UniProtKB/Swiss-Prot annotation:
InterPro entries: Kazal_dom_sf, Proacrosin-bd. Keywords: Cytoplasmic vesicle, Phosphoprotein, Secreted, Signal. Residues 192-220, 232-243 have a biased composition (Basic and acidic residues). SUPFAM superfamilies: Kazal-type serine protease inhibitors. Expression restricted to testis in normal tissue. Expressed in a wide spectrum of cancers, including bladder, breast, liver, lung and colon cancers. Residues 185-272 are annotated as: Disordered. Residues 26-106, 319-427 are annotated as: Pro-ACR binding. Residues 221-231 have a biased composition (Acidic residues). This is Acrosin-binding protein. It comes from Homo sapiens. Pfam families: PBP_sp32. The keyword Isomerase does not apply.
Amino acid sequence: MRKPAAGFLPSLLKVLLLPLAPAAAQDSTQASTPGSPLSPTEYERFFALLTPTWKAETTCRLRATHGCRNPTLVQLDQYENHGLVPDGAVCSNLPYASWFESFCQFTHYRCSNHVYYAKRVLCSQPVSILSPNTLKEIEASAEVSPTTMTSPISPHFTVTERQTFQPWPERLSNNVEELLQSSLSLGGQEQAPEHKQEQGVEHRQEPTQEHKQEEGQKQEEQEEEQEEEGKQEEGQGTKEGREAVSQLQTDSEPKFHSESLSSNPSSFAPRVREVESTPMIMENIQELIRSAQEIDEMNEIYDENSYWRNQNPGSLLQLPHTEALLVLCYSIVENTCIITPTAKAWKYMEEEILGFGKSVCDSLGRRHMSTCALCDFCSLKLEQCHSEASLQRQQCDTSHKTPFVSPLLASQSLSIGNQVGSPESGRFYGLDLYGGLHMDFWCARLATKGCEDVRVSGWLQTEFLSFQDGDFPTKICDTDYIQYPNYCSFKSQQCLMRNRNRKVSRMRCLQNETYSALSPGKSEDVVLRWSQEFSTLTLGQFG
């Protein structure tokens, strides 16, 4: 068996991303300063190459697996910063995630919160003020006076990586489309010889040694060693990467390396040969792949480029069943199963096409509990992917009496510590859990510590980004048709109404609706009102 996606994606994405020599096409009115953010026009061009979202998700998988020190991602990050990856705090255009301690943290935040097209912007205050050491000193003080926002200043950066820009290739879009097409292939035919020769020339400068990538990840906090490693890596060829791809395409010996599927080797050890004995799954795995390709907005790109299905003999549809199943297991194990498009497609296929229905039961007499939209299905699939014996899904009947939730699902939930409440159409009440703590705790902390508290701001940021819907996804409207200038004021109002046994939810902002816009001054009054009411409540209880 060929190596799974974990080993394939890095090699493939090196081919995918290297042609992106961005160049950062300079606006006629503004020169590109090394280390500065891209202009709106440059970002538009940059993000066009990562649209639709499944393209951005492909790069995020590589970042999650190999970290920011991966040479391919270093190059991509250089492009986004006019050649220099800043060493220190950076700012973004996200309303409640306005700055990050590093550009790497910013990119991880975009991926983990699915805001793939958030932009880096110039900071409105000096970078030194936003540095981690300064923040620790501020937090240690008894009281913090608000910082006056100043006009944007010229960026100050220290260099971790540098690159000389090349013009945007004329064939850039075509190359990216072609290579992204290949990203859906796991072990397909080799590319045309002349194309591989071209890659060999263009990619001669790319470092690909995996042990250096891992070494860079383990020593991210040691900047000097990182820079030294980066220099040592420069000038390396892509011979190893090409050999890895070739091995994936030609190796017919069934092999499985669990360590390539998970950072914890013992956490994922499926026996694919055992799963082969599950005929309902194996015989319909190709139908699942088709379904997965058509949901979550991926149908648009496939409708426009339907020739991919017919002309790409290395696509998932042509994979042997065991390998396709391995890819699916990898997707739900390495990510949070209940929020993955893979799980949604898989669930749809088994419910609608295979006829299992909504309830989820297995051959051990267990009935998997539906504590959230995909919890029962993910509970079963995580068990199947990890199982050393044959575990089959069955249609539920009276013989399935044991309620069950996989501990593997619980461990995934604990790793993020957040739980989204039951969704309503166009509405969002908030996270049931954040950091393992309920909303009442966070409302209380908001009232006592304020919006600027580090933990409170993290809660607000996560909630804000958990719901982006409507004509204006980044604006904040509620079910009383009030529009708020910031998320803290909305959450204060929601906590206030919750304390009065009245439910107010965030609602998508629509173009054809009229809202009462809250001024910044009024929004501060809302925050203060909740703080005062909470203080009165606690004084009444304890005094």
